[in-house]
């Protein structure tokens, strides 16, 4: 490949790697939010606020 083709390939690879990193970060953030939400529900329910307790 000529230098321009090499640079384009390199840029595409770099962009793909950055995209993959972003997706991992999004999953991590979603996991943290889910954990915080679960904890908040347990705390809310433990202080006898029945409106926030999960119905079983």
From Swiss-Prot:
Which locations, inside or outside the cell, does it occupy?
Secreted
- Out of the domains of life, which is the source? Eukaryota
GO annotation, cellular component aspect: extracellular region
Keyword vocabulary terms for this entry: Disulfide bond, Neurotoxin, Secreted, Signal, Toxin
Propeptide positions, renumbered to this chain? Answer: 20-42
Tissue expression summary:
Expressed by the venom duct.
Q: Name one GO molecular function term.
A: toxin activity
For this chain, the family text in UniProt reads: Belongs to the conotoxin T superfamily.
> What's the entry's take on its domains?
The cysteine framework is V (CC-CC).
Name assigned to this protein: Conotoxin Ts5.5
Q: Which organism is it from?
A: Conus tessulatus (Tessellate cone)
């Amino acid at each position: 490949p000529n230098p321009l083709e090499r640079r384009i390939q390199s840029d595409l690879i770099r962009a793909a790697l950055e995209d993959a990193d972003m997706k991992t970060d999004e999953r991590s953030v979603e996991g943290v939010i889910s954990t915080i939400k679960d904890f908040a529900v347990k705390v809310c329910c433990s202080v006898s606020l029945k409106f926030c307790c999960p119905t079983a």
